[in-house]
Amino acid sequence: MFVDDGSRDGTWSFNSSEKRTSIRGLHFSRNFGKEGAVFAGLKAADGDCVAVIDCDLQHPPELLKRCIAWKNGAEVVEAVKASRGKEGIIYKLFAKTFYRMMKNSSAIDLDGASDYKLMDRKVVNALNEMPERLTFFRALSSWVGFRTERVEFDVAPRNAGKTKWSFRKLFRYAISSITSFYKRACR
């Protein structure tokens, strides 16, 4: 399942020109955001397992071979960042603070976590059944509580283009995520 979140770089025309019957795609008319794209892909995917991977190649596709732990009983194989790549000091500090606040407010430890995961069908079904409107895939995929194995990777430089995540967008996303998972709100 390929999800094109309203890109304007020709990605969709390149993908749709290939005659591969094993690959299906969703093409959004505009950018609805990472979370919307991930959850739309999860709803449309129908395999025994589903991998979530960014297309900017900062998530190395060859790591999927190491996600074989899924066949050995892991229900989620999560790729965790051994190194964060070439992030600026401000971004690293912001990420570290955000993860600490998430852990303190929700007991979900996201240190080193990424959205790069391979999940069993029952995990995908559980995520698809959740009523959340403000989604945070990285946390929800941990919160649902399935058996998880971890594999490490080093974040590669972006293959092309620039991130659309400004500091302001990241800050708003962080506040929304923390308040959505605040443990007192769940009581």
What does each of the following model-derived ranges do?
Residues 1-6, 26-27:
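Short beta-strand/loop segment that forms part of the nucleotide-sugar
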Residues 4-13, 57-58:
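A conserved acidic beta->alpha catalytic loop
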Residues 22-24, 147-149:
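Conserved beta-strand segments of alpha/beta enzyme cores
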Residues 163-164, 175-187:
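Membrane interfacial helix-start motif at the N-side
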Residues 24, 28-30, 34-44, 49, ...:
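Acceptor/aglycone-binding surface of glycosyltransferases and processive sugar-polymer synthases
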Residues 16-20:
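Short, conserved SAM-binding/catalytic segment
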Residues 30, 55-57, 153:
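Short, conserved catalytic or interaction motifs in soluble domains
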